[in-house]
Amino acid sequence: MTEVETIIKTVLKTGGYRLGSKSTLKSLRNGEAKAVIVASNCPEEVLEKIKSYDVKILVYNGTNMELGALCGKPFSVAAMAITEEI
């Protein structure tokens, strides 16, 4: 298991996260996001918006479908915000 996968598993247990590009960007605008995890195939326009914030960005080596599955969701997840210290 990679470091990013370990972080994902931890925040899924504690609830300190927001799933999806829109929720992630909202968390960034509100100053709630401490870090962001993006799928390897995250859309470029979303990634550029995330990069405009001063936040740590971690890249999950799987696709958005794989990230969604890892999060226990039946849909793709291109980005997720971590809202607690990691």
Curated annotation (Swiss-Prot):
Keyword Isomerase appears in the UniProt entry: no
Any single Pfam family the record assigns to this protein: Ribosomal_L7Ae
Any one of the GO BP annotations: translation
Gene Ontology cellular-component terms listed: cytosolic large ribosomal subunit
Gene Ontology MF annotations: RNA binding; structural constituent of ribosome
DNA damage listed as a keyword: no
Keywords, sorted A to Z: Ribonucleoprotein, Ribosomal protein
NCBIfam families, per the entry: PRK01018.1
Family from the record: Belongs to the eukaryotic ribosomal protein eL30 family.
Name of the protein: Large ribosomal subunit protein eL30
Organism of derivation: Archaeoglobus fulgidus (strain ATCC 49558 / DSM 4304 / JCM 9628 / NBRC 100126 / VC-16)
Lineage: Archaea, Methanobacteriati, Methanobacteriota, Archaeoglobi, Archaeoglobales
Record gene name: rpl30e
